[in-house]
């Protein structure tokens, strides 16, 4: 996207990559809003991207992720519903709208490896975007 910045860590010991809002948007009070980031993330099969709200957004602004922690699986990348574009589902706890400017850092992502059980035989195939894992 135009003028989209890749996430970056701000210090050498930061675990999370700061994720910016990809557009100007108003977060409606007491509702969930999907914030577009303009980003996609490719990962190896044994990795996922964990998305968290930035602590300053939660503590100072009353914003929370609607699902507590976003889990972006490796097979979300280039899915047929939305091509794997990352969105952040934010809940505004306040009684007034909250404006987020394009470029504001709203979340952070941490790339994580995971293990599977010895007898794991998952054969499902992602058939779309958010919440759409199934078998083709």
Residue ranges and their predicted role:
Residues 1-136:
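DUTPase catalytic domain/fold
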């Amino acid at each position: 996207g135009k003028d989209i910045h890749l996430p970056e860590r701000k210090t050498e010991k930061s675990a999370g990559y700061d994720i910016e809002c990809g557009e100007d948007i108003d977060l409606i009070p007491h509702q969930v809003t999907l914030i577009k980031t303009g980003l996609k993330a490719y990962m190896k099969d044994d990795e996922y991207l964990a998305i968290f709200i930035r602590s300053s957004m939660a503590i100072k602004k009353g914003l929370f992720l609607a699902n507590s922690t976003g889990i972006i699986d490796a097979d979300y990348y280039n899915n047929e519903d939305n091509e794997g574009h990352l969105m952040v589902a934010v809940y505004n706890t306040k009684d007034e709208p909250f404006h987020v400017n394009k470029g504001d850092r709203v979340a952070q992502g941490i790339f994580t490896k995971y293990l599977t059980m010895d007898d794991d035989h998952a054969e499902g195939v992602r058939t779309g975007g958010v919440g759409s894992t199934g078998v083709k």
